[in-house]
């Protein structure tokens, strides 16, 4: 299968054909030249390019070389798209327990949208104020898939899983105090959920959930 060997990176141009989504660029740890060369290579072969965990400095590097780049500061993502817009598929709902979870939740949203999905967002509906979530029960129950993002005790996906028939993708975040262990407590809570139909991704992995 073809790839482009840049020396410091082997860019997989056929991943979109195999998996339905092109290779994604993880920005941290890359020099300006490396990031720009990889991005240029991807743009030449793909109609959509996603760069994750990009800080404003990384965006400035890419924007100077590729002016069509778009930055989502909350999600820390850079997106480049070309060609015709395709109709979006409805049914993805992303819920976040707290405002501090939004960078991870928005990363999931950007990823899902780039994959051709119309995404609805429901923010700050953690279980400490469960009435905030129940106010949107009809929105939850019409979703085809729900991504539930939470730190602290990580209970939101279990609650959502008990309210909907759709699959739930649980995303633990590193938000929380001491004994949250940078998201480990939320991860273990989600893995041990008694609600059926829940899949769990890694801590802070909004991209993996989207």
Task: Give the positions of each predicted feature.
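Long amphipathic alpha-helical segments
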Residues: 1-60, 64-65
